[in-house]
A protein has these predicted regions:
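Active-site clefts of carbohydrate-active enzymes
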Residues: 2-15, 80-89, 124-125, 130-131, ...
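Polysaccharide-binding and catalytic clefts of secreted carbohydrate-active enzymes
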Residues: 9-16, 39-132
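Proline-centered flexible-loop/turn and helix-kink motifs
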Residues: 38-40, 114, 165-166, 211-212
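Short, solvent-exposed loop/turn and secondary-structure capping segments
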Residues: 55-60, 181-182, 228-229
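Glycoside hydrolase catalytic-domain groove-lining segments
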Residues: 92-107, 111-186, 201, 205
Length: 291
């Protein structure tokens, strides 16, 4: 979703102390969901993606205090004067602000499109999210979402999130790529197009073996341009290339897994157990162009 009042100067937090914030969210949600109401192919809406204030609450509070006069600054000054300027209290203020924001968005979604789900915010690694933050999410989300660039979602990580949240879970982003088409390595890379298919099946089928798991969002449909997107990222991460030619090994793997997911999720079948050879995260290896 867009235009919900999340402010770059607040590290993607919303100033819920502004008297117009409810109106902004209400109008934005109403306008955005109008095009999707009644669409049976849509399951729900993501509210946001990887907010940068997560685990930076103390820093964000200092930025607010050092910043220009605005409603959230006055509210923070009042809160700290009453409760004490401590690290826990700064975090508590940010989480209470976040709670108010999520509550307002949730109310608007139920008002304007009650037939679709609130898929929450696509966080990063759930293990980096405190239990207090997860409890806030639990109150407002229908589904807990996170991006997960790993060989597969860690079972212990999923168990922890499931125990705290008791919600279904979706991976918002993951992918595998290689460099044989002249593009850069992806956030998780393998040695060939064939291994991309192996990696896909291993990731998705093992994810679906968890009882709380209901979906994986592959990033992305099409390769990125060789000249790069706005930040220069130019990965071989697509199901198709930039001229819409499918990567057959990957597409066949998607089809194969899709036929097995219900049986895997119900425990009737075991997930694919062949790991891709030499799969590695982007940050762990040198650029393969230099090898």
């Amino acid at each position: 979703m867009r235009d919900l009042g999340m402010d770059a100067q607040l590290m993607s937090l919303c100033d819920v102390y502004d008297p117009d914030y409810k109106k902004v969210i209400d109008e934005s949600v109403s306008s955005f969901v109008a095009q999707f109401k009644g669409n049976p192919w849509l399951i729900g809406y993501f509210v946001s993606n990887e907010p940068s204030w997560i685990n930076n609450e103390t820093r964000l509070c200092q930025m607010i205090l050092n910043g220009t006069e605005r409603p959230i600054k006055k509210a923070l000054e009042t809160y700290l004067a009453k409760n004490g300027d401590t690290v826990p209290n700064r975090r508590r203020f940010i989480l209470e602000t976040f709670d108010t924001f999520l509550s307002t968005v949730s109310e608007a979604l139920k008002k304007y499109d009650p037939d679709h789900l609130n898929l929450g915010i696509r966080f990063g690694d759930p293990d980096t999210l405190g239990e207090d933050l997860l409890e806030v999410c639990k109150r407002h989300f229908d589904v807990f979402s996170f991006n997960c660039y790993q060989l597969k979602p860690d079972a212990a990580m999923l168990d922890r999130a499931a125990q705290i949240l008791d919600l279904p879970m979706i991976v918002g982003e993951f992918h595998f790529g290689t460099i044989d088409r002249g593009l850069a390595q992806s956030l998780w890379q393998v040695d060939s197009q064939a291994e991309r298919g192996v990696a896909y099946r291993y990731y998705v089928e093992n994810a679906y073996s968890h009882p709380n798991f209901i979906g994986t969002g592959y990033f992305q449909w099409c390769d990125q341009d060789i000249t790069g997107r706005f930040d220069g990222e130019n990965y071989n991460c697509g199901l198709v290339d930039v001229t819409d030619r499918p990567y057959r090994d990957l597409v066949n793997a998607v089809s194969e897994s899709s036929h097995n997911l219900f049986q895997i999720h119900s425990g009737e079948s075991r997930p694919y157990d062949r790991q891709p050879k030499n799969a590695r995260g982007h940050e762990l290896v040198p650029d393969l162009w230099n090898e």
